[in-house]
Structures are given as C-alpha cells and as structure tokens.
Amino acid sequence: MQMEQILEQLLRGESLEFGSARATLERILSGEVPALAVALRAKGETADELAGFAAAMRAAAVRVAAPADRPVLDTCGTGGDGTGTFNISTVVAFVVAAAGVTVAKHGNRSISSRSGSADVLEALGFRIDLPPAAMERCLAEAGFAFLFAPALHPALKVVQPVRRELKIRTIFNLLGPLANPAGAPYQLIGAPSREAAAKMAQALAQLGTRRAYVVHGEDGLDEVSITGATHAYEVSEDGLRYEKLTPERFGLTAHPLEALRGGEAAENAAIARRILEGEAGAPRDVVLANAATALVVAEVVRTLREGVERAAQAIDSGAALAQMEKSAALTRTLG
C-alpha cells in the first residue's frame, strides 16, 4: 500500500491492523515521514496500531542485554503531561533499584516539558551517552542503567525533527514506553489519558509483556497520583484488569498537585536529592506510591502498603541515595 493511501485511510478514520501498522512504521524508520503522526493523532491510535508500531520499533532498536537471573523493570512515562511536576519516575527508579529490582530506565531529553529524564540525570552527575555495552555493565554491576532513546533507536532520528516542530503529543510519545531496548519484562508506565492507558495496556498484552501497570492520574499525571484517584490497567498472564488507586490504598495522605511542582533540570535534581536524603512531604509520598506500585509489578511484594514500607526503608536507610551515587559514578568511569 502506498503511503498516500495509508494517510487517506487514516484521515477517513479507518484504523490499521497490526501487520499494516508494523509495515508502516518500518517504512517511516527507513525515511518516509509524511503527516502520518498528525493523521493518527486526529483519528486516535488503536491498540493494534500501537502494538504493530512498537513491534517495528523493537525490531529496529539496538538491543541491550539485561541480566537473566533477576527481575528487570522499566519506570517510564510518556512525558510532557503539562502538570509541571518534578521527574517522579526517575527518582522512583533509584528507590526500586535499592529495594532489589534491576531497573532498565528508558528515556530521553525533554521534548515538550522543562526537564526530561536524561536532563535531570545529567544534573545528578550521570553520563547518559554510553554505548550499549556500558549500559549492560551498569545493569549488571549497579542494578540501574539509563537507556538513552536516541542512542538505541537510531532509526528514529528521521522523526525527531518532526516531533520537535509539531510540539504536540503524537503516537511516538506513546511508543517509547512500549519499546524498551532491554526487553524489560516488568513495567510501570505512565499514560497521558485514561483512554491511552487502556490502549497501551492492550498493546503490551499483545506484545507479550509479563507484567505491567499502565497508569493515569485523574489530575492529569502520567504517574500514580497522590492528589486523588489513579486509573490503573494491569497486564499479566491472566489478561487485563482495571482498578482505581487512591492515596488511602497506600496508607498515604492526599496532597495538592501544586506540592509536586518542579522546574528546570537543576531544580528537579535538587528535589530528587532531598527526597533520597529523607526529606518528608508530598514529593516523598508520590515517590513512595509509585515505587510501591513498581515493587508489586515486579512481584517483590504482594500489597501496595507493603511496597510503601519497602520503599520507605530503602530511602530511610540511605540505600536509595547510595544507589543513585553508585550508578552515577559508574557511568562516569565508563563514559
């Protein structure tokens, strides 16, 4: 099928099947980038399209070998949710790693927000431009590695200028969390809407993910929220399951969204360090909620409250701060 025909099909509101979606993205990655992203945005992406596109992205990615003898998790959101919070999932990654889960965090620089995960990690002293072999050493030796998307998805260089020019969320925002180059079998993914969360969960199920939670806060957060309810879609070998998470489920107090605001990378790095040094307050609580969910996903704990206890112990013992510092130091020796 010609690309013009695909565009016409999408603009008529007709969806692509899995095979057509995969073939389409393979052509995009080889250099054909018309207004496809805009057409998909206007129509609304389906789970089949997401799964097909993600399969093509995974096949084209540079692979990073993850340790086979331990659980490996990714904490990744679609980013740019417009809420202006600090880099929650990045801090969560250190807490979860300190609690015994190897974290292969897939991420990028900011495209529409003030600070992406790559930006805040650099502000915390990380080298992010590591080759795949160095990333593998970070996973094996430190239990944490940052998988810098541009280095591992080189074919996406053809769409990056389009994303920056459009300055709107497109299907590529949704695809990043679905295409972890280390093939992390456990995932905690943040979505930009409840509808997107449901579709991303369906796509993960098609792609054979072992276990994942795809979450969206009613306040707009692409994280587990502590301002109110969070819509959560669980993917497991038993299929898909929806549940609503609230701060009370974690044994935590609700906080206003304003208490979670961040800023540029340097400010967000300072917030991250204060949390890991044990400072109490809303930023710590939202990290505890997300870390607890991640620990449930990785099958380290059974309940959210048990997860909060494990996460709090990782912070209060100094293990999470040590995890961050050890991981950063290793990247500097390898870079």
Protein language model features and the residues they cover:
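Short beta-strand segments at enzyme active-site cores
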Residues: 35, 103-106, 214
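N-terminal glycine-rich anion-binding loops that anchor highly charged ligand groups
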Residues: 1-3, 10-51, 58-67, 286-287
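Active-site-proximal loop->helix
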Residues: 109-126
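Short, small-residue-enriched loops and turns at beta-alpha junctions
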Residues: 14, 41-44, 79-83, 110-112, ...
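Short amphipathic alpha-helical face segments that pack within enzyme cores
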Residues: 35, 91-95, 290-293
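Active-site cofactor/substrate anionic-group-binding motifs, chiefly glycine-
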Residues: 44-111
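Glycine-rich anion-binding loops and their surrounding alpha/beta cores
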Residues: 9, 56-62, 85, 100, ...
